[in-house]
Amino acid sequence: MALRTIDALDLAGKRVFIRVDFNVPLDPQGRVTDDARIRAALPTIRHAIQAKAKVILASHLGRPKGKPDDRQKLTLEPAAVRLSELLSQDVILADDCVGDGVKKLVRDLKDGHVLLLENLRFHPEEEKNDEAFARELASLADVWVNDAFGTAHRAHASTAGMARFVKEKAAGFLVQKEVEYLGKALGSPARPFVAIVGGAKVSDKIKVLENLIAKADAICVGGAMAYTFLKAQGVPVGKSLVEEDKLELARQILERAEARKVDLLLPVDHVCGAEPKETAERVVVNDRAIPDGLMGLDIGPKTLDRYRQRIAAAKTVFWNGPMGLFEQKPWSEGTFGVAKAMAASPAVTVVGGGDSAAAVEQAGIVDAMKHVSTGGGASLEFIEGRELPGVKACEE
């Protein structure tokens, strides 16, 4: 099924409901500290404005638990203020996302004007994909557009449910870009195709690794998950984080990679500490084996060099998961080193959301990447080969 996109529709004079992802971080004063997700939705919003649509935006923010101060702490007002600045036009903020007051605001909305509904998750029915709630949202719209890739793996009322009750539906430009880039990187990659996979647990990345073993030429492993693989090979790892119940699974993954002639590279040296703290002494262990009393907290310099060489020779590089505890400076060189190597590469470079996207942002090299995914869980599920409800709902 082909993805129908917003530019294929006539939007003039229509009520266009765009599901965006404005789940942005706020400071204690309630100001937006990182507007990347708002900026990512601008091409779709601007297209709808220029097409003279009545633009209705909807998003969630945080995880409201029905507490009295939720409405104050998790209001979308800061997002409305920032969006208004970015668009250089007024953005009306509704005090709810359903109800008579919202219906009146939609009725009064002029062509080319923008209304932002209040936090969808103030209603528990949103995450339950409640049919009555989905129908109520759908009653506000002639056209439904999904431009929230970050929640595309969730079958919620606004991300999938309401699409059944709206005549016209489409993907926004951000969802289109995500599906095209991730699909191309994994479906028909230019070779050599190198994957960099990190993070704490093998169990979190089983499906990702299985899918990549079927497609990649080489997989470079970092992060705490590497110690489970090393221990599975009989290498001492000191007091590093290991998933003891996943050692057999790690062996099977290594065997599968070998059988398919995929180079699965593990660290050959490590940056270690006695504990995972910024104040711990930084010890470079120039060997695969980690001594007792130390834990691996980052890949070592030799390993980083090996991974850099693989990145430099690749035509496609996909990265998901940090190489170490990069949030703390002593253990950040491996992660930032990989990020910089990817930025310097002429290859198609795709960063698969979550912590790796945060690392690229911190390194200040987002623009050097061909694609940085806005979806953490969504990009992982896409890579695992799963169907995303929020994408399927946009198909013709």
From Swiss-Prot:
Coiled coil: none
SUPFAM superfamilies registered for this protein in UniProt: Phosphoglycerate kinase
The reaction(s) this protein catalyses: (2R)-3-phosphoglycerate + ATP = (2R)-3-phospho-glyceroyl phosphate + ADP
Compartment(s): Cytoplasm
Positions of ATP binding: K205, G296, E327, G353, G354, D355, S356
Enzyme category, top tier: transferase
Residues making up the signal peptide according to the UniProt record: none
Cytoplasm found in the keyword field: yes
Sorted UniProt keywords: ATP-binding, Cytoplasm, Glycolysis, Kinase, Nucleotide-binding, Transferase
Main location: cytoplasm
Subunit structure: Monomer.
Family affiliation: Belongs to the phosphoglycerate kinase family.
Protein name as it appears in the record: Phosphoglycerate kinase
